[in-house]
Structures are given as structure tokens and as C-alpha cells.
């Protein structure tokens, strides 16, 4: 059975890039364009890992992370953002990993594989 990853990012290009790249790695990928949509998707689906942007309109990624950890305590969340300074914020420490967005997705793919193989 394929692992299911939920990609949450307000930028459509990023969502589609991650979907394509992660499907090539053999994952099933669901998409959400906002924090609100992500929480709805988690209620509806069996997701194995969440790839979550921080800076989004509405509910930001740090708040989404907090809500995920309240309801789905063991669900791994990887924060993936263009802003490295958020790594120092206490609210991000509940994530399993913090990746700075890059056009080279090797680090991201390796971290996802590592987390799902635990």
C-alpha cells in the first residue's frame, strides 16, 4: 500500500511540483491550498505525512501544525518554507523536520523517506 502525503501550500506551482515529484517516488499525494482545506482533508482521508508551508493566508502553518498535533498526535509533519528564520520559533518545534524550500528536492525526499520508514 502506498504512503499518502498531504501537500499544503498556497502556491499552486509548488503544490503541483511536489505532487509530480513525490508521485514519481511512489507516494500517493493529496493537495490542499490552505490551512483550513488541510484540516478538512485530514478529517476525510487517511494521511501518513503532511508537508506543510508556514506562510499562508488565513490559518498559517504554525497554527495548522498545532491543531494537527492536538488531534492526530502521531501524524508526522514536515514544515517546508522559504523562510529559514521560522525554525527558531517555538511553535515549529513540534514538526518532525524543517526544510527550507529549494529547487533541489533531494533533501526533502530523503527526509520524507526517513520519517515514513521509522
Regions found by a protein language model. Give the residues of each.
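His-Asp phosphorelay/catalytic-motif detector in bacterial-type signaling
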Residues: 2, 46-48, 72-76
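Charged docking surfaces used in two-component/phosphorelay signaling
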Residues: 16-24
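Helix N-cap/capping motif at the beta->alpha junctions
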Residues: 31-40, 61
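Short amphipathic alpha-helix used as the core "switch/output" element in two-component signaling
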Residues: 40, 62-73
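Active-site residues of response regulator receiver
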Residues: 53
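Receiver (REC) domain active-site loop signature in two-component systems and cognate sites
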Residues: 56
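Alpha4 helix (beta4-alpha4-beta5 surface) of REC/receiver domains from two-component response regulators
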Residues: 63, 83-101, 106-110
Amino acid at each position: 500500500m502506498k504512503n499518502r502525503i498531504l501537500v499544503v501550500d498556497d502556491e499552486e506551482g509548488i503544490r503541483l511540483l511536489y505532487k509530480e515529484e513525490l508521485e514519481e517516488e511512489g507516494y500517493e499525494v493529496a493537495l490542499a491550498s490552505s490551512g483550513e482545506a488541510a484540516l478538512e482533508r485530514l478529517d476525510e482521508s487517511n494521511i501518513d505525512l503532511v508537508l506543510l508551508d508556514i506562510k499562508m493566508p488565513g490559518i498559517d502553518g504554525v497554527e495548522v501544525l498545532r491543531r494537527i498535533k492536538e488531534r492526530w498526535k502521531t501524524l508526522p509533519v514536515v514544515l517546508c518554507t522559504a523562510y529559514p528564520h521560522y525554525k527558531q520559533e517555538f511553535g515549529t518545534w513540534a514538526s518532525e523536520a524543517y526544510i527550507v524550500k529549494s529547487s533541489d528536492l533531494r533533501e526533502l525526499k530523503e527526509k520524507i523517506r526517513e520519517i515514513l520508514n521509522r
